[in-house]
Amino acid sequence: LFPIGTLYDPFIARGLDALNYACYQDARFMVVATPSGISLAPEGGAHQSISTPMIGMGQPGLTSFEPSFGDEVAAIMGWSFDHMQAKDGGSIYMRLSTKPLIQLVRDLSDADKSDIVSGGYWLREPGDDCKMVIAYCGAMAPEAIAAWEKLSEDHPGLGLLAVTSTDRLYNEWQDLE
């Protein structure tokens, strides 16, 4: 049995002592936070979560994700329950949006799911003549897709990178050095 909790994303800092202690004690849990990002909080600047991604990236024992689409959430949750049970696993911090997004209609392969939980995948693969890539995370997907559609004619080979976990991408990049 693993606890799954929800919270208002900007207020995760209020529980940092407990979060740090739980992660260092190897507690296993999933925390789901909304709303993520700076463009989503109708309450105004005092309630925007611009520093919370760093909490997810910086806390040992906690893996953070910020998916855009429902099928990404499903892939991440499937991986997360295995990760929470693994001897070398840990806890999960998932940042979600309250912004309505039109969902993609697609069947994810095992390779697609692996890319999603690894931190990112090409929503539009770059061509051989790629000189530019648009990367997005979370609720900014519609704006990034619209930008790709607008720019792809003038920029052949333009890629569109969906980042589902800055945490996992950064840590894997660090492991390469």
Regions flagged by a language model, labelled:
Residues 54-62, 151:
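A broadly tuned preference for mixed-charge, low-complexity surface segments
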Residues 2, 63-64:
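Secondary-structure boundary/capping signal
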Residues 26-28, 61, 155-157:
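A generic structural signal for alpha->beta connector loops
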